[in-house]
């Protein structure tokens, strides 16, 4: 006759299984978990029975959140021993190694989130500070791009645009003054000499045709000026004096 071996049960524990395990442990104690699993009639392994008892069914377990003293002690012991959860659990009565490990992971996850939230406002404020200290208008950006595109010729172009020179509107009076300037002899002008002469006389100055029809010595150099005038648009026989 062939006996059919039942399959080992896995998954969540029921209330009936918890009661059977508690009664068996009270009878035989917390040892020989393979024997307890067999005697109790539970279709569970010895390891599963032990973990269920230690983490959930032990009467000395503490329930609820960690106290501040327990939290501080966990941090100190972990800094000293690392991830040796069973050794840390011995220093905290009523707390299991699995519970301590879960608390540590939750604590580290919360600490990482706080660090990330503290870093994000500082980075955004630094970018805003840089933008406020270094504003770049669209015209500045376009000017920089044009300067880079033309190989640095943007400065020359801007200077030429800012200081336009209108050669067509160059006054002819200024041209004649520049032509006559090198030939004028230094000394008092004719008007000053006329005033000084009038002041030196005791009586009133009599009218004399020479004063009204005086022509500067530039008229004597008519031939030389006619040669220069055509390059400025004047025809033959046209000069500064008539």
Swiss-Prot record:
This is Myb-related protein MYBAS2. Residues 118-133 have a biased composition (Low complexity). Transcription factor. Pfam families: Myb_DNA-binding. It comes from Oryza sativa subsp. japonica (Rice). InterPro entries: EOBI/EOBII-like_plant (IPR044676), Homeodomain-like_sf (IPR009057), Myb_dom (IPR017930), SANT/Myb (IPR001005). A motif (Bipartite nuclear localization signal 1) lies at residues 62-65. A motif (Bipartite nuclear localization signal 2) lies at residues 109-117. It is found in: Nucleus. Residues 5-61, 62-112 form the HTH myb-type domain.
């Amino acid at each position: 006759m062939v006996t059919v071996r039942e399959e080992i049960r896995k998954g969540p524990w029921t209330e009936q299984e918890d009661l059977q395990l508690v009664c068996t442990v009270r009878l035989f104690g917390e040892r020989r978990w393979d024997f307890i699993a067999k005697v109790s009639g539970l279709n569970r392994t010895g390891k599963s029975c032990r973990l269920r008892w230690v983490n959930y069914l032990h009467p000395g377990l503490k329930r609820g959140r960690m106290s501040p003293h327990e939290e501080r002690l966990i941090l100190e012991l972990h800094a000293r021993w690392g991830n040796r959860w069973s050794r840390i659990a011995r220093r905290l009565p009523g707390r299991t190694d699995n519970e301590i490990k879960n608390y540590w992971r939750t604590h580290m996850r919360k600490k990482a989130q706080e660090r990330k939230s503290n870093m994000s406002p500082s980075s955004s404020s630094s970018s805003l500070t840089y933008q406020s200290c270094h504003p770049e208008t669209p015209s500045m950006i376009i000017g920089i791009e044009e300067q880079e595109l033309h190989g640095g010729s943007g400065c020359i172009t801007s200077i030429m645009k800012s200081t336009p020179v209108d050669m067509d509107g160059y006054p002819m009076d200024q041209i004649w003054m520049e032509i006559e300037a090198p030939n004028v002899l230094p000394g008092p002008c004719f008007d000053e000499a006329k005033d000084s002469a009038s002041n030196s006389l005791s009586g009133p100055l009599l009218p004399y045709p020479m004063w009204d029809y005086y022509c500067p010595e530039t008229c004597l150099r008519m031939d030389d000026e006619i040669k220069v005038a055509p390059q400025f648009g004047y025809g033959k026989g046209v000069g500064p004096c008539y």
